[in-house]
Amino acid sequence: MQVFNTLGKRLQSFEPHEPNTVKMYVCGPTVYDEVHIGHGRTFVAFDAMSRYLRVKGYNVVRVQNITDIDDKIINKARELGKSWNEVSEYYSKSYLEHIGALKVKIDMHPKVTTHIKEIIDFVQRLIDSGHAYVANGSVYFDVDTYPGYGELSNVKKEEWDQGEEIVKEKRHPYDFALWKAYKPGEPYWESPWGKGRPGWHIECSTMSTRYLGTKIDIHGGGMDLVFPHHENERAQTESLTGSTWVKYWMHVAFLTIRKEKMSKSKGNIVPLKEALSKYGPSTLRYWFLSSQYRNPIEYSEEILEQSSRSLQRLKDAISVLRKIIQKGPAHYAKEEDVKVQEEIVRAISRFDEHMENDFDTSNALTSIHEIASIVFSKLQYSEDVFGALIALDGFRKFNEVFAVMDEEFSAELDRLTKVIDAVIEVRNYLRKKQMYDLSDQIRDILSRSGVKILDSKEGSTWRFQ
């Protein structure tokens, strides 16, 4: 399996630090407004990665933070005439509600304001180790103490313009704030350097190491976070640990509208809650994953409507398979049936091959539509129950990653289980009659469709492989 590492800009073999565990940290939103479909695309992309890794047998631990104190939150509170924590609490709840609707699975949602003590400790250790300094109640990271600065983003530190307001109190114009000194009317916490609040970048370093340790397998987010956020995170964390912190840096490409990047400044933001209301979670997930995560994805009503039609085609294929299976029982496989079954198995294998090539959901989706084409062109005119079972299992594997047909499979899995139980009963009967050629053929066909038979003296049981 290969993934693209932003650090080095190349594909690398995926080998997590621990053989059976993947530690993943994804930067979550700053909750000063509704999350938009660009956020949704990023979160669903990493969700599909997590789901596929779990299918592969990994124990995935995914942490995604919530930045609930920031300049933008303070400004929004002033604009609305509310307190900063009212604003952050409202938008935090909205964010959690809507990514829940998108079926994004996240193990932990740490908030900045519940980790102030840990952040202060992290900053103090950077000061003690000579990587940070205090200036007028603020604390800055001394970028010159980290030789690897710029390796992730290929941005030269001298080119980083942070504005002129606080440059004078810094050693270098490109040093960045770890702790911001208190300003009248702003929230604050007590610290060894006086009243203040955390800088942006220190938050993620603190919370990621708090829950995942100093060796993280995947750290990700949108492409816009490569610089300065992830560059600064890497600098401050590795300065403290003295070793490589993140093994694979992964970033999701921009979402565009009429070929322009979606942004507040252009006024073309589409809130996630509006898109969910209009198209539903399954169509949105399908659309998000129809493009490989490193490729930009275009938003338009026409494209979303096409995604809805394409998803419906897959659901229609499942309906055809259900009818074939309900015809049962399975008959002795004809030669032409075996060829169709092998064709379906190859398409399922291609799905895995594409997912193992840097989570290429776009081509993986093409493989699933190939199965649908086989269903409509060949299977629906046959009585090939085994072929239908193989195809249905392919759709099941697809849905474990894409999560766009949960409704079909909650009922369909129950039906599938009953059908397989019936097939196993027939096979047990054949074995008792010593008709081993037929019983072996059933075993082999089920094995190709992902069903493992466990034989014993008492009979046979089964499980999905």
Swiss-Prot record:
Main location: cytoplasm
InterPro entries, per database record: Cys-tRNA-ligase, Cys-tRNA-synt_Ia_DALR, Cys-tRNA/MSH_ligase, Rossmann-like_a/b/a_fold, tRNA-synt_1_cat_dom, tRNAsynth_Ia_anticodon-bd
CDD domains the record matches: CysRS_core
A Pfam family annotated for this UniProt entry: tRNA-synt_1e
Names of the cofactor(s): Zn(2+)
Gene Ontology cellular component list: cytoplasm
Keywords assigned: Aminoacyl-tRNA synthetase, ATP-binding, Cytoplasm, Ligase, Metal-binding, Nucleotide-binding, Protein biosynthesis, Zinc
Enzyme Commission number, as recorded: 6.1.1.16
Cell compartment(s), UniProt: Cytoplasm
Catalysed reaction equations from the record: tRNA(Cys) + L-cysteine + ATP = L-cysteinyl-tRNA(Cys) + AMP + diphosphate
Example GO BP: cysteinyl-tRNA aminoacylation
Annotated motif 'HIGH' region, positions: 29-39
Cofactor binding: number and manner: Binds 1 zinc ion per subunit.
Binding site for Zn(2+): 27, 204, 229, 233
Top-level taxon of the source organism: Archaea
Sequence motif: 'KMSKS' region, positions: 261-265
Positions bound to ATP: 264
Homology family: Belongs to the class-I aminoacyl-tRNA synthetase family.
Name assigned to this protein: Cysteine--tRNA ligase
Taxonomic classification: Archaea, Thermoproteota, Thermoprotei, Sulfolobales, Sulfolobaceae
Name of the gene: cysS
